[in-house]
Amino acid sequence: YVSHWANKKDLLTPNNPQFDLATGDQTSGGSHSWNSQFGVFGRINYNYKEKYLLEANLRYDGTSKFPTDLKWRWFPSFSAGWRVTEEPWMEGAKEVLSSLKVRGSWGSIGDQSVSNSLYIPTMSLTNSTWIHNDAKDVYYSTPAAVASDITWQEIQTLGFGIDAQLFNKIGITFDWFERKTKNMIVGAEGLGIGFGTTAPNGNYGDLSTRGWELALDYGHV
């Protein structure tokens, strides 16, 4: 990604916005950044008589945003379903319980939504008048502290659900889920006041959420 910009102040007339018709200071700047991602995945499905359903997935993802030995990671996921009403011993209940399916799943996926150089010490260039009031001097900031072993954040999701239909009219769907974010990229804690700079970001955090959903629908033909 490449960007360039330029600015000139004190435009003589807003009806003709050209650089030649501005008399103030002219400034310009730009930036250049890049990143790359690559991933492959495979999937296996199994269906036995529309009764037992299985699925397995496996991803292999890489990104340039992390150190060479930490940029690649495997992410698996699995799901299974059982259509209970397809069992022979459920035939007598189908007048009331038209359909019943029990399902479950677990999976993980990577998150690399961070800046490109989070693990690289960088120095920023700045113009300032804090040394000489009448002139802008160029100075570089000291490199920030970084975590050299930073890697993927991993999101794991566990879920169970039931889909049911009564009298071919009333639909019931229930879902329970747990979502865990492991190795969250956050600022380090517990550093003394004499550390001397901003705390580095690294895979120091974890987050867990749970919830459930219930949905009802009615269809009359």
What are these model-predicted stretches?
Residues 1-221:
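Extracellular/periplasmic, surface-exposed regions of secreted and cell-surface proteins
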